[in-house]
Amino acid sequence: CLAEHCFRAGIPEEDTVRWTKAHYRLPSDELLIRETVKSVYRTAKGFGKKSSLTAEQLFAMQMDEFMKRRYEFRYNALTTEVEYRERHSFNYFRPVDKRVLASITMNAMCEGVKMWDRDVIRYLDSDHVPIYHPVEDFLYHLPRWDGKDRILELANRVPCDNPHWAPLFRRWFLSMTAHWIGMDKRHANSTSPLLIGPQAYRKSTFCRMLLPPALQAYYTDSIDFSRKRDAELYLNRFLLINMDEFDQISPTQQAFLKHILQKPVVNTRRPNASAVEELRRYASFIATSNHRDLLTDTSGSRRFIGIYMTGGIDVSRPIDYEQLYAQALELLYHN
């Protein structure tokens, strides 16, 4: 009976009475429940000597308790890696590599938990590890926009004579943010600002500054268009891709570049995967160059917002990223 199972599992008598009342639709007469449980506890033998759980269930519960007590885990949806940190520590989340895996196993053994590497891997590959979306975690914890136009301020840091630069940058910036939150899954952010100016104008620094510190890991200025599969995977892995030294892209790669700029989703096979899958695109593009003669496509260059800079970009002033992106969300949701 239930009371006997609880007795052999080592559950105190009062807890058995209380849990029985809470979880089962038994007669409302508490005295009857209490006397029944009391009778079993007085006559049964072997309190706590035999659990009603199997050895596998006990091990799974023991492992789950150890992992949650010692560590925090999360599955990064962008990097497709499991990240960890020690619980009650000030450490940042770091990827779980072979050394970390071995350390977790050894720490468990030191506590008497007979875990092996394969058990830890099975745990980390399961839904016991919550999914973490870096973009959503940043954007959906922002304060309300205070009404100050910080997107315009950011655009005005780039000195140029083009009167259309500020509204074009605003449109591109809003499109970049919209694709991060999945507002438009049928079209890509197919236009790219192209900053043109001499060296030391801090073009690359400005591009990197567009992402807040919390999302800097999802910025890259190293993309090789000759490796097409890797380039397509970058659309899912990164939020902002800077085509630094745009003039170095060869004419033979221009057709693929045009294709990838307007690709709304990625249909490819992940590394070590066995099947092709549809991956969500997050990435927007921006580009820089020191040379003016860049866009030689005779069919037109509507995908690039070419800006000839008249001076260096001001990167000395800090950016209020929370208000910058709060403004973007406000405009996207209400305009």
Give, region by region, the residue ranges found by the protein language model.
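Structural motif
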Residues: C1, G10-I11, P130, C160-L168, ...
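Short, hydrophobic/amphipathic alpha-helical patches that form generic packing surfaces
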Residues: C1-A9, R18-W19, R122-Y123, D137, ...
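Modules that initiate DNA replication and primer synthesis
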Residues: C1-S52
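Short, well-ordered alpha-helical packing segments
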Residues: E4, L174-T177, C207-L211, L239-L240, ...
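Hydrophobic/aromatic-lined pockets within catalytic cores
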Residues: F7-I11, Y24, P159, T177-K185, ...
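N-terminal nucleic-acid engagement/recognition segments and initiation subdomains in replication
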Residues: G46-E153, C160-P167
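Feature primarily recognizes SF3-like P-loop helicase cores of small DNA viruses
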Residues: E111-H133, A188-T191, A217-T220, S226-A255, ...
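P-loop NTPase catalytic core of nucleic-acid-dependent motor ATPases
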Residues: S126-N236
